[in-house]
Structure formats: structure tokens, C-alpha cells
């Protein structure tokens, strides 16, 4: 009698099963500290989560803007003398800076670290064609109000990037303004519809007899 191999049993048990796809977590990074947010995101990536980071241009770094700008300009001067094309590569956009920060907190030379890094996507602003409406989360322990004292100076990452070569801050600002205005119009429309529905429901219930109203209340329809 030939027993089935473990591989054949596993294949048979997997047949017809749906492949598990992790839920995508959308993290809103407005007023978050760059290092703290990157550390928590890196840990969640290693646990197998898929993360989309939005509004990276509104991340914050400790210290004044001049100090952080000088530090980043010093980093821009670092290069490989024999062949500068081989690196280090200097990113100017806030999303790339955030990705690089997360990468430095992952074991990126192992397959596990490389797989985790592929699960992260970062954007400036909130692209409506990529990020679904609502459902954004924040990281409370990485927020600026939690980490910094009120008098501590800080730098907004987008403002610093604008001084070191990022060209699209005005474009992002324009798109964000358009998105907020569109969301406000949508909210106003839904509020109007909700108010109309409530008034129509009230009118309909006023025309119902007492006995029928009691029955409706019993089942939670009035």
C-alpha cells in the first residue's frame, strides 16, 4: 500500500480554497512624526499587512526647518567617487523619503524584508482613484501632539523637500484643495438627501393609524 505524500495531501486540501489576500490599510500621515510612523509601519509590514500611506508631505521632523535643510543638503553631497550612478540615490519627494525611512527599518537584504517592503505604497496627497473614500486610519502614538512638547520646533517634510529639489508641492496643494471642495459638496448633498428622507418618513408615520404604528414600533420600523 502506497501512502500519499505530504505534498499531495497539502495540494488536495488547498484545492478549491480561496487565496488569502490581506486587507489594505490606508494610513493618513498628516501631523505624524516621520521616524515613529515609519517604525510602526515597518513592524506591521513584517506581520504581513498591506499598507498604503497617504499625505506623506505633511509628515513632521524634529528641529527647525533651516537645521533639517542643512542636514539634508549634506546628505545630498554624499556619493560614490568611483561611479556616482551606483548610489547613494537622493530622493526629493516626501513619499520616497518615507519609503526609504521604512526600508532602513526592515531586513531588506532578506527575502522576508523584500516581501514586506513590496506591501507598502506611499503617496503625496490623497489620490481618489487609488484610495477609497473614508476608511483612513491614524497612528496615535506617532502623532506630533503625542510625541512633541507644544513649544518644540518642528519641520513639515513637504516644506523641506521644496527647498531641496521637490517640484510638485504646488500641484499637490492644488489637487488637495480640489479634493476637499468636492468632498464638501458631496457631504452637503448627502445631508440634504438625509433631511428630505427624515421629513418624508415623519409625514408617512403621521398618516399611519395607532394600531399599525404600534406594530411598526414593535419590529423597529417606527
Task: Please give the residue ranges for each predicted region.
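Ribosome-associated RNA-binding proteins
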Residues: 2-222
Amino acid at each position: 500500500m502506497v501512502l500519499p505524500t505530504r505534498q499531495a495531501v497539502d495540494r488536495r486540501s488547498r484545492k478549491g480554497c480561496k487565496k488569502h489576500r490581506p486587507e489594505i490599510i490606508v494610513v493618513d500621515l498628516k501631523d505624524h512624526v516621520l521616524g515613529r510612523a515609519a517604525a510602526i509601519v515597518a513592524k506591521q509590514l513584517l506581520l504581513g499587512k498591506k499598507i498604503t500611506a497617504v499625505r506623506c508631505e505633511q509628515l513632521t521632523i524634529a528641529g527647525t526647518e533651516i537645521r533639517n535643510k542643512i542636514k539634508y543638503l549634506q546628505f545630498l553631497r554624499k556619493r560614490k567617487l568611483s561611479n556616482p550612478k551606483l548610489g547613494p540615490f537622493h530622493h526629493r519627494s516626501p513619499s520616497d523619503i518615507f519609503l526609504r525611512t521604512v526600508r532602513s527599518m526592515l531586513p531588506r537584504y532578506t527575502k522576508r524584508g523584500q516581501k514586506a517592503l513590496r506591501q507598502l505604497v506611499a503617496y503625496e496627497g490623497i489620490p481618489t482613484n487609488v484610495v477609497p473614500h473614508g476608511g483612513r486610519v491614524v497612528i496615535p502614538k506617532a502623532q506630533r501632539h503625542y510625541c512633541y512638547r507644544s513649544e518644540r520646533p518642528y519641520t513639515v517634510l513637504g516644506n523641506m523637500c521644496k527647498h531641496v529639489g521637490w517640484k510638485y508641492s504646488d500641484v499637490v496643494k492644488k489637487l488637495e484643495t480640489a479634493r476637499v471642495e468636492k468632498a464638501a459638496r458631496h457631504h452637503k448633498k448627502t445631508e440634504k438627501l438625509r433631511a428630505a428622507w427624515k421629513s418624508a418618513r415623519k409625514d408617512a408615520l403621521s398618516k399611519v393609524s395607532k394600531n399599525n404604528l404600534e406594530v411598526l414600533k414593535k419590529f423597529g420600523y417606527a
